[in-house]
Amino acid sequence: MAATENTLILETTQGPVTIEMRPDLAPGHVARIKELVREGFYDGIVFHRVIDGFMAQTGCPQGTAMGGSGQKLKAEFNKEPHVRGTASMARAANPDSGDSQFFICFDDASFLNGQYTVWGKVTEGMENVDKIKRGEPVKDPDKIVKARMAADAA
């Protein structure tokens, strides 16, 4: 049960993406993302900022990169590296400004290490992340059709 409780499944327009969440690295972030998932917050939200060779960002209800859930999170920076498949929290200049937006790295992004909260890693479906349409902003963006915790699907 513990493994599925920390397994996030994103049904995207490009196919399913499974992220193993890491409460050992970022307990506050993982708990908040689970809350948002269970509230249906991420359902229908677009990948609004997608930079080739870098990352795909989602989690803004307006699709503008300016919105969120309204609940800021205290930074939980850790030593986990930003590499291909890393799931990390987006934020503004203030380290404690993470909210609902997160990104998945397409490739190594070590320049982010220790400055953004890593909270998980893609374990299945990275090929679907690779297919997400690029752009800033993205024209006709891909989206999260439905986000769910594996434990809730059982």
Predicted feature residues:
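Cyclophilin-like peptidyl-prolyl cis-trans isomerases
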Residues: 1-154
